[in-house]
């Protein structure tokens, strides 16, 4: 189960091929990848984010109970720093969280957290960075979202493989 959409571009996995490679990899392992985002595409004109090809589309504005039921049936969850990742964690599912904008201490503890600390990261928790909710493209340090762009598929694959070994 995957969640690829969020409420600000800084929260996305901005690696242009990341989700495509991840879904292809999971499909090659025999997994049916189900996308449970609210929307199949989201963003602003000129910067839209789309559900990856190869996913089963269960997007929609569904009740929380339906999402809990979806999560109950998944082996593990891959998502962003968002509410559904927290919900999956609360449901006891292993969560592979892809997030560069938030600090480790600001999210639930997970052995499968994916962050690249070799580049700009954790602006969300830096009190000198003032979040501008009216600016979809908010990147306070003007690094073009390198915090998540520089999270490679290989980094995510490593966490997927670790997770699969434990379930």
Regions flagged by a language model, labelled:
Residues 13-103:
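Donor-binding and catalytic core of enzymes assembling or modifying cell-surface/extracellular glycoconjugates
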Residues 1-10:
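Conserved donor-binding/catalytic core segment of Leloir-type glycosyltransferases
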Residues 3, 59, 115-116:
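Residue-level detector of conserved, well-ordered beta-strand and adjacent loop positions
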Residues 50, 89-166:
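Nucleotide-sugar donor-binding patch of glycosyltransferase catalytic domains
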Residues 9-13, 146-147:
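A generic structural signal for short coil/turn motifs at secondary-structure boundaries
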Residues 4, 35-47, 126-136:
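Short regulatory "switch" loops immediately downstream of catalytic or recognition motifs
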Residues 4-5, 37, 77, 152-155, ...:
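Bulky hydrophobic/aromatic packing residues
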Residues 5, 56, 141-142:
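A short, mixed-charge helix-start or loop-turn motif at secondary-structure junctions
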């Amino acid at each position: 189960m995957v969640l690829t959409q969020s409420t600000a571009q800084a929260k996305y996995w901005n690696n242009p091929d990341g989700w495509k490679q991840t879904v292809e990899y999971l499909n090659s392992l025999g997994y049916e990848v189900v996308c449970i985002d609210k929307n199949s595409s989201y963003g602003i004109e000129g910067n839209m984010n789309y559900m990856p090809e190869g996913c089963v589309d269960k997007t929609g504005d569904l009740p929380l109970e339906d999402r809990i039921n979806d999560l109950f049936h998944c082996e593990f969850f891959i998502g962003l720093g968002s509410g559904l990742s927290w919900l999956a964690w609360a449901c006891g599912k292993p969560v592979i969280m892809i997030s560069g904008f938030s600090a480790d201490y600001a999210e639930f503890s997970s052995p499968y957290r994916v962050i690249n600390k070799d580049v700009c990261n954790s602006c969300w928790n830096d009190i000198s960075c003032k979040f501008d909710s009216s600016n979809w493209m908010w990147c306070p340090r003007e690094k073009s979202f390198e915090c998540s762009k520089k999270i490679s598929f290989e980094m995510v694959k490593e966490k997927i493989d670790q997770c699969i070994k434990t379930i």
